[in-house]
């Protein structure tokens, strides 16, 4: 079996991706020849400054090119099966500051394309393709992502509404190269999570832990983060997307270290994302209350991962996570009543308010999930993937239990749900904040492959935290 690094020595499979997108085009728009046109992200300047903004490549363009250059374009002639990449021409003034750019011959060696030209040749190439199809071809591009100077002269029509949707659908199922990229992002992020655990031993502030994570990612080849890291100690962990990362790890009143810290962070490798969450003890060992909640969440995750295979209904997996949570919270005495009644009344949503997971790829919340944020059923409202999971998809499995006063207190005050929550028992758990455990899982025909190897068994985590 080829190793990740061996696979990634090859070219990113841009041509195969172009053909995959073309299948959607031909299925929905048979007849006239189709031509796909995409542009990369532009270099943008920071306002009131002569520095460029951080560059993030447009994902549709990368999916069909594998190219990270700004100011580039591509054309895919579907019937001719010809993929042409256009890269910036040499700008003598820019060479002074940044050195020579990539040449067309060098680009041919790097990318899985049939031809490489420079961007001044885009319009002539489009006109030539339109002429070859006798004016019957239709150009497909993305609204708002085409330069004013780009012309589709000679085409029967230019459609700006369909292409993005086709690409988003195509991206759901990953090929072996994409799985290798996701695994590489996970491998780097695992090293960073371990570094963060070790940094927490002596850290006094959340930002020190964040710094250790980011530094380790950069040192191992993931210069960008998949998203802004979440480093949330104590009750901060009850905020799902806690943004601050600047709280002291010692309680200002008790002068004691807080019980635990939630770290939700992942590095990005060649545009592909890792998204991993771990909770670690700040005192070396988990406090009793944290340990109890951690055991429930880990059980939720393990049972849900075991359900994964081609065609599984994600709604069912999400619902199962809630049933495991209800059972665990009943055993602790936080909830009271029957499991079925608590499930039907959606009481567990007070403690597990988000969806079980989302597709993962070039975006952290990747395309193709078809969520229904208007769902009147609050258990499923924030589930980012609805429907059956296909083999080849990669999904996060990230159950959690949180003690967020803003979310839970309305349940306590409601005449309909207050009887199900024992507030005396609940009082002991506010300081836990939140526990979430998140892995990135590749769905296969008969099961799954967990791409995440960051430690999550409590004994393993404690051995690193001591």
From Swiss-Prot:
Bound cofactor: record note: Binds 2 manganese ions per subunit.
EC number(s) reported in the record: 3.4.11.9
EC class: hydrolase
Molecular function GO labels: manganese ion binding; metalloaminopeptidase activity
Protein's GO biological process: proteolysis
InterPro entries referenced in this protein's UniProt entry, alphabetically: Aminopep_P_N, Creatin/AminoP/Spt16_N, Creatinase/aminopeptidase-like, Pept_M24, X-Pro_dipept-like
Residues annotated for Mn(2+) 1 binding in this entry: 275, 398, 438
Superkingdom assignment: Eukaryota
Keyword terms: Aminopeptidase, Hydrolase, Manganese, Metal-binding, Metalloprotease, Protease
Annotated catalysed reactions: Release of any N-terminal amino acid, including proline, that is linked to proline, even from a dipeptide or tripeptide
CDD domains in alphabetical order: Prolidase
Cofactor: Mn(2+)
Residues that coordinate or bind Mn(2+) 2: 264, 275, 438
Residue ranges the record marks as coiled coil: none
Family matches, as Pfam families: AMP_N, Peptidase_M24
Function of the molecule: Catalyzes the removal of a penultimate prolyl residue from the N-termini of peptides.
Sequence similarity: Belongs to the peptidase M24B family.
PANTHER family in the record: XAA-PRO AMINOPEPTIDASE 3, XAA-PRO DIPEPTIDASE
Listed name of the protein: Probable Xaa-Pro aminopeptidase pepP
Gene encoding the protein: pepP
């Amino acid at each position: 079996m080829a190793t990740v690094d061996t696979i990634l020595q090859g070219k990113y499979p841009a041509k195969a991706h172009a053909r995959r997108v073309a299948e959607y085009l031909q299925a929905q728009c048979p007849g006239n020849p189709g031509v796909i046109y995409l542009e990369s992200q532009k270099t943008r300047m920071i306002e009131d400054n002569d520095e460029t903004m951080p560059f993030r490549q447009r994902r549709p363009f990368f999916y069909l090119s594998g190219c990270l250059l700004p100011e580039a374009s591509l054309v895919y002639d579907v019937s001719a099966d010809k993929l042409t990449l256009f890269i910036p021409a040499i700008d003598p003034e820019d060479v002074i500051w940044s050195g020579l750019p990539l040449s067309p011959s060098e680009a041919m060696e790097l990318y899985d394309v049939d031809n490489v030209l420079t961007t001044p040749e885009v319009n002539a190439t489009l006109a030539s393709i339109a002429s070859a199809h006798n004016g019957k071809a239709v150009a497909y591009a993305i609204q708002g992502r085409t330069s004013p100077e780009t012309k589709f002269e000679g085409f029967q029509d230019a459609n700006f509404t369909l292409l993005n949707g086709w690409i988003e659908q195509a991206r759901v199922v990953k090929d072996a190269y994409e799985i290798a990229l996701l695994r590489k992002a996970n491998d780097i992020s695992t090293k960073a999570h371990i570094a963060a655990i070790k940094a927490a031993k002596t850290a006094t502030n959340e930002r020190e832990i964040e710094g250790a994570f980011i530094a380790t990612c950069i040192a191992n080849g993931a210069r960008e983060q998949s998203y802004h890291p979440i480093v949330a100690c104590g009750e901060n962990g009850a905020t799902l997307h806690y943004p601050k990362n600047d709280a002291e790890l010692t309680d200002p009143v008790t002068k004691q270290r807080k019980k635990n810290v939630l770290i939700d962070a992942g590095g990005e490798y060649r545009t592909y994302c890792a998204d991993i969450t771990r909770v670690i003890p700040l005192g070396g060992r988990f406090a009793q209350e944290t340990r109890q909640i951690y055991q429930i969440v880990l059980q939720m995750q393990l049972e849900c991962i075991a359900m994964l295979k081609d065609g599984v209904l994600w709604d069912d997996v999400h619902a199962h996570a809630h049933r495991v949570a209800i059972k665990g919270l009943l055993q602790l005495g936080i909830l009271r009543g029957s499991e079925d009644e608590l499930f039907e009344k959606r009481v567990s949503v007070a403690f597990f308010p988000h969806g079980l997971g989302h597709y993962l790829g070039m975006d952290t919340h990747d395309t193709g999930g078809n969520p229904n944020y208007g769902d009147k059923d609050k258990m499923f409202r924030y589930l980012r993937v609805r429907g059956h999971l296909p083999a080849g998809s990669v999904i996060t499995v990230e159950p959690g239990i949180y003690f967020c006063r803003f979310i839970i207190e309305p349940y306590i005050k409601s005449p309909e749900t207050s009887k199900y929550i024992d507030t005396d028992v609940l009082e002991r758990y506010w300081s836990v904040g939140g526990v979430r455990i998140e892995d990135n899982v590749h769905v296969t025909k008969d099961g799954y492959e967990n791409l995440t190897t960051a430690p999550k068994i409590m004994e393993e985590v404690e051995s690193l935290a001591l």
